[in-house]
Every structure is written in C-alpha cells, then in structure tokens.
Amino acid sequence: MMRNTLVLFLVGGLILVSCSTDKMDGTSADAIVGTWDLTALDIDQQTASDEEEFGQVILSELSAENCYLVSLTFNQDLSLITEDASNYLEIGVNAGGTGLEVPCPSQRDTETTTYTYSDGVLTFVDENQATVSLNVSIDGGTMIISAQELDVENFNAGGELIFSRR
C-alpha cells in the first residue's frame, strides 16, 4: 500500500511538472513586451550596396558608445512608444581626416501608437495613420526586422535591423 501511494505521488508530480508553462517562444504575444534598441544592421557583405555598408558602420559606431538611434517600447497595454533620432544624424570627418565622426544625436522624435503582435507579425499604426504589418523574429533578447519593411530613415536600403532588449 505504501509503495502504491509513493508511486502515485511520483507520477502525479511528474504530470504537474510536465504540464507547467513552457518556455515563452518568440511568437507569443508577450515575447515582444519591453524596450528594444536598434544595435546593428546585418547585411550580406557580398552584395551590399554602399548605402547598406555605410549604415552598418554608423550603427556599429553609435552602439559601441551606447547610443541607440531607434528605441521601441512595447507595453503590456498594447501601446508602442517609438523614439527615433535617425533624422538628426550629423556625419562628418574626424579631426585627423582618417575616418568618420558620428556624434550621438541629442534630439529624438517620439511617437505613441498601438500595436498587436501575434505569430511573428507586428502590426501598428504609423504617423500617417496607415496600418503597417511586419514579419518579426524574436529569439530571447534579439529582435530582427527587415530594414526595408521598417523603413527607418537612412537605414532602409536593405538588410536586417537587429534590436536588443534592454
């Protein structure tokens, strides 16, 4: 009798553990909640245009200084706050004339809208009141969006925009 009771508790415990919530995948509605900073532009080095390569270098330089041109905050209440400094980039040549000087923009445009995220598709209303739907890939703390689809000023020639969760 004691043995049957022990087996019953072990089986019951295993069932409870196996029925617990699984690890959240990148397509669940909660996977996108949080603040995401644009940290990189991933391009095909073999076929990339000069504009894509230039964008990649700029994002790399700014990210190394903890300066993020675009931040997206997805709230639990389905509001989306976008902070975008890409319109305020001032690119120059450094004092030695040997490379670029890209100071972190101090000015940002901030917009608030609503969004939905389901099965890897992000849908939101843009500043022109148009509904935009994008395919989004989320893997842990990394979110990837097509640069052409998101259409961030100066970074929309091609490639994939890489966002990192704060």
Where are these regions (language model features)?
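N-terminal hydrophobic or amphipathic segments with adjacent small-residue motifs
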Residues: 6-7, 28
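C-terminal motif of bacterial Sec signal peptides marking the signal peptidase cleavage site
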Residues: 15-18
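Short, linear, compositionally biased motifs with a strong N-terminal bias
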Residues: 11-12
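Positively charged n-region of N-terminal signal peptides that target proteins for export
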Residues: 1-6, 20
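Lipid interaction determinants
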Residues: 20-166
